Amino acid sequence: MPVKAASGAPSRGRLLLALFPATLTALLALAACRSDHRTPVVLYSPHGRDLLSLLEHTYEKAHPNIDVRWLDMGSQEVYDRVRSEKANPQADVWFGGPDTIFFRGAREDLLEACRPTWAAAIPPEAREPRGLYYGAYRTPAVIVYNSGAIPPAEAPKDWDDLLDPRWKGKIIIRYPLASGTMRAIFGLILSRSIEKTGSTAEGFAWLRRLDAQTRSYEMNASVLVQRIARREGLVTVWDLPDVLLETKHSRELGWVLPSSGTPVIDDAIGLVKGAKHPAEARAFIEWVGSVEAQRLAADRAYRLPARTDIPAGDLPAWARDVEQRLVPAKLDWERLEREGSAWMATWDREVRGKGNR
């Protein structure tokens, strides 16, 4: 069987930046020439247009001297770009992605210490001891299905249900090499294999069975859930905020919190080392973690706050419901950080497109 091709074209902006490494610098310089003398704060983020636009407009309204600019890409792509630009950083704020990726960034000296006033409200396990990054949101992974084609009672309820023969050819998966969310989900499967047998072999066998069920691997995260809504596939796995945002546009989306537990990603934020606008970047980070901005993100962009000092009664109904039903999976995040890249290389070499062999 030929290897499955990752479907979906990157956006025009992403394609230009991928093809021409100097494009970002040129675009920022051009924008500066046309600016109204505001100070730019450049964000690299996987958080998507809805949240980024919301924060951009809200922050700029309160700080008219600031021009918030952002580049939306996968969390692994953010890391790769910040790393490649280390000698001449173009971003000011690294905003979003699992803290396992931020750990790598800290180890490679890509981040600079920043100590916002809300740091103590973040659990110790979700903040770097030296102040290099902090959790901003808690992001659970969910099973997503087309509720127009699948009655809720018949939808997959847990990870193993994805291997049921009735879903063969009906699953679309986000291309995991570019996605921190998918690395966490695949990492959960492999970690459980190690815990049970002492080896990843059973976990990779599970992933091969999932590959046999998979219709395609989607490169573009922004259209993954849309494809399920359009019935190009019927089932996927992805992060809850993106799914809830898409339900504003489609009534044919349902989601399930896996009954055995799901990865809950500490979506972090940090100051890029060598940022061109460090003071403005620190001020933006301070605002993102403020009670005001955390509530705004929960109300308008379906983000669970990382802060532990916000009363449940101050959160929207959807967040209270998720917190009550959520079963966080026990996942060895340190092992995932150490071995995740090797696991993904093995998946790409030995699993992708080989499930039916």
What are these regions (language model features)?
Residues 38-48, 66-71, 170-171:
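Short, well-ordered beta-strand elements
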Residues 46-47, 51-53, 76, 90-232:
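Extracytoplasmic ligand-binding site segments that recognize negatively charged/polar headgroups
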Residues 54-69:
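Short alpha-helix C-terminal cap/hinge motif
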Residues 100-104, 229-230, 234-252, 301:
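A ligand-binding cleft/hinge motif common to bilobed small-molecule-binding domains
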Residues 121-124, 139, 205-210, 217-218, ...:
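Periplasmic-binding protein-like
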Residues 142-149, 190-192, 266-278, 296-297:
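A bilobed periplasmic-binding-protein/Venus flytrap-type ligand-binding module shared by bacterial periplasmic
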Residues 272-330:
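Mature extracytoplasmic/periplasmic domains
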Residues 329-357:
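Conserved C-terminal helix/tail region of periplasmic/extracytoplasmic solute-binding proteins
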